[in-house]
């Protein structure tokens, strides 16, 4: 069971610090129309519940979600399935990545243009392909006017943000990057903020900035 909240504001897309209010917000918005620029590409459905399924299904093929109020209580229940012929399962009985992604999708779809959505580690519990698709989704919502503030350690998330710029799906000036390497003597405050060119290239690539995969591949190739 998931709680409702007198403090959470559906207008401000507040799903709670741990996503605990996401099912409640889903129930409130389930049959509301979603703005066209936030809909999954080439998907004709317009309702909130259908768009939640469209985006979840993009990250986790075949996945869908359902939430409903529990009669006589202030709680909601949440279920997932991994295919139309699959049985509905509680979040505890399904992969954690889906449970973690659900509040992110609900928050992004609920947010209005200009509102800020703060996301910590959207790549959590996702394999590389799913991380890449998460990056695509974040870029589209940013392009739709939602201010998406992300803390990430995923090179896949970064790469898809840059690809969105290259594909003209996101303006270069709308992608701000900040790399926190820690303050070191003689190196300022340890924050580097490379700018993004229109082709997705970065103006600067600091040491230790998403470079470990390349370092490892070079080491493998040298032997």
Question: What are the language-model segments listed below?
Answer:
Residues 119-122:
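Walker B catalytic motif
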Residues 103-106, 156-160:
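Short amphipathic alpha-helical face segments that pack within enzyme cores
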Residues 113-116, 145-149:
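Loop/turn-to-beta-strand initiation segments
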Residues 1-101, 107, 112, 195-223:
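Phosphate-coordinating catalytic segments in nucleotide- and nucleic-acid-processing enzymes
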Residues 58, 136-144, 158-223:
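RecA-like P-loop NTPase motor core
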Residues 151-153:
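H-loop/switch region of ABC-family ATPase nucleotide-binding domains
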């Amino acid at each position: 069971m998931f709680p409702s909240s007198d403090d959470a504001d559906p207008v401000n897309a507040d799903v709670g610090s741990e996503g605990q209010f996401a099912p409640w917000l889903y129930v409130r918005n389930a049959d509301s129309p979603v703005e066209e620029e936030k809909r999954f590409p080439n998907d004709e459905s317009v309702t909130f519940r259908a768009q939640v399924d469209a985006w979840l299904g993009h990250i986790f093929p075949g996945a869908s979600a359902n939430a409903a109020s529990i009669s006589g209580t202030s709680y909601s229940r949440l279920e997932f399935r991994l295919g139309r012929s699959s049985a509905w399962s509680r979040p505890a009985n399904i992969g954690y990545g889906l449970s973690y992604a659900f509040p992110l999708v609900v928050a992004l779809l609920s947010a209005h243009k200009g509102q800020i959505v703060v996301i910590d580690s959207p790549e959590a519990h996702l394999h590389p392909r799913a991380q890449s698709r998460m990056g695509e989704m974040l870029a589209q919502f940013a392009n739709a006017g939602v201010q998406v503030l992300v803390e990430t350690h995923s090179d896949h998330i970064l790469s898809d943000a840059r690809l969105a710029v290259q594909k003209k799906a996101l303006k270069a000036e709308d992608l701000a990057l900040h790399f926190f390497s820690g303050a070191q003597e003689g190196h300022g405050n340890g924050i580097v903020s490379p700018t993004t060119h229109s082709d997705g290239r970065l103006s600067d690539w600091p040491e230790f900035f998403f470079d470990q995969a390349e370092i490892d591949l070079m080491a493998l190739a040298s032997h």
